[in-house]
């Protein structure tokens, strides 16, 4: 403690905040306290106090980011994302609350809410005589430890009477790394019942060829976040080229996400990766705006 005028109780409180912060980190084993640590902790407590009320009162909104086929020049799907639209703070991005909800378990209820909203939206399109597109939803690792997970998903699909192919499940690459044997079995069971599975964020963590060899999925979503901001380097081109070719040889569809520039899009097309998701085509937008974009004449 550098300031002798800080009361002992305050100093202990500061040390407590720093201790909680450092426990969340996997690399550093010490940290210096500053006020941002305390502010972040207080913000998390506030979100925990408000999350139940927010869900019950419709503050969580489903946003959709289109998946666009560059060759066909049309939207072929979307990913459902969630935004917390707070009456006082405005839009709270998911990076602020998803990890907290993973930690306290609230993510299970929030995921279920998003899935239900998506199924309802697809049912609406069908009832209106419009041609729906598949919507993918994110799945927390916590769901995969529920022995009834498959039954929950199938029950939701049956409740709204939609084809299974229109609700796709997105599992992040990091899930498979932690328990590949368990998740390989779960995925095999899900696919046997006709549920479409995507591996999200491939290339953003510790991508494993062994993982791809053992896990049978429908779509590989390649994270293009590793692109150099100044342009695509030769090494990046080589990695991307062979990753896409490998996925296709394994009979997987490929979606490139995080595509932000025309150069990136054109290079992906040259590799026969024609479905993209990213700000180059469209940012995540409210579901009502997505409908207008999808069905504009």
Identify the role of each PLM range:
Residues 1-2, 30, 40, 70-79, ...:
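Catalytic core of bacterial c-di-GMP phosphodiesterases, primarily the EAL and HD-GYP domains
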Residues 2-10, 16-63, 71, 101-105, ...:
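C-di-GMP signaling machinery
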Residues 25, 57, 69, 87, ...:
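Nucleotide second-messenger and two-component phosphorelay signaling modules
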């Amino acid at each position: 403690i550098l300031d002798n005028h800080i009361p002992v109780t305050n100093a202990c409180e500061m040390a407590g905040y720093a201790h909680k912060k450092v426990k969340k980190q996997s690399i550093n084993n010490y940290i210096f306290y500053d006020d941002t640590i305390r502010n972040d902790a207080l913000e998390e407590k506030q979100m925990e106090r408000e999350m139940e009320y927010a869900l019950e009162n419709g503050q969580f909104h489903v946003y959709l980011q289109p998946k666009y086929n560059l060759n066909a020049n049309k939207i072929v799907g979307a990913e459902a994302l969630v935004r917390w639209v707070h009456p006082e703070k405005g839009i709270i991005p998911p990076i602020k609350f998803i990890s907290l909800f993973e930690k306290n378990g609230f993510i299970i209820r929030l995921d279920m809410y998003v899935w239900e909203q998506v199924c309802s939206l697809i049912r609406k399109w069908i009832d209106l005589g419009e041609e729906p597109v598949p919507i993918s939803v994110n799945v927390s690792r916590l769901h995969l430890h529920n022995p009834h997970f498959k039954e929950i998903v199938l029950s939701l699909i049956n409740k709204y009477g939609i084809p299974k192919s229109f609700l796709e499940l997105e599992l992040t690459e990091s899930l498979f790394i932690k328990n590949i044997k368990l998740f390989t079995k779960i995925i095999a069971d899900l696919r046997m019942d006709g549920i479409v599975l995507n591996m999200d964020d491939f290339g953003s963590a510790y991508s494993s060829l062994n993982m791809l060899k053992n896990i049978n999925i429908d779509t590989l979503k390649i994270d293009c976040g590793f692109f150099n901001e100044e342009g695509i380097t030769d090494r990046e081109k080589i990695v991307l080229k062979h990753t896409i070719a490998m996925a296709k040889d394994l009979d997987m569809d490929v979606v490139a996400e995080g595509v932000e520039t025309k150069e990136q899009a054109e290079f992906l097309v040259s590799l026969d990766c024609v479905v993209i998701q990213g700000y180059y085509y469209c940012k995540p937008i409210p579901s009502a705006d997505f409908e207008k974009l999808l069905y504009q004449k």
